[in-house]
Amino acid sequence: LPIAEVGAILKNHSAIFHTDAVQAYGSEVILPHELGIDLLSISAHKINGPKGVGFLFKSDAIQLPPLLHGGEQEEKRRAGTENLAGIIGMGTAVSLLTSTEKQARKTAYQSFQTIILKALEEANIDFSINGEPTNRLAHVLNLHLKGIPSDLLLMHLDLRGIAISTGSACTAGTVDPSHV
C-alpha cells in the first residue's frame, strides 16, 4: 500500500506508524504529518552525507523511552557524546537537498532505468521486474535475470565499473534468500 493509505488506516488505531524512508528521502517529498507517519528514519549516506549518522523524525504525539540511561542528551533518551561532525555533515547534506535537486535526481534516475531496461530488451535478456512495475522509486530497479547467477553478474558488472547489489545490506555475505 502507498504510505498515505497506511497512515490513513492507522489514524484511528493505537498503532504507531514507523516508516524507513532511507531510500526515498533523496528523491521524494515526504511530509510526515500529511502522511500520518509517527516515526520516520533517514540515513545520511543516501543523500551524499557521512556514513553512520541519520535522524529519526518523531511526531509530538509519540513518547519514546530512553535507550541508554545516565545523561540529559536527546531529551533524556540517549546518554553519551553525539557524533558532532556527522550531525553537521548530515545537516549540510539535508540543506543542499532542495525540492529542485530531488526532482532532478528523480528525473535522472528514471532516465537510467529506461536506458537499462531498453538495453536488456535489445540484448534479448530474459528478465522481469520484481515488485510494482510502475509505482516504484526511480532510483531502485529490482530485477530478476533468468538463468544468470547473481554472483557472476555482480563480478562482471563490477569489472566494468557498474555497481549493483544482489540483496539487501542485511543479507550481505550470504547466498541465502532474504526472509522478508
Give residue ranges: language-model regions.
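Pyridoxal 5′-phosphate
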Residues: 1-180
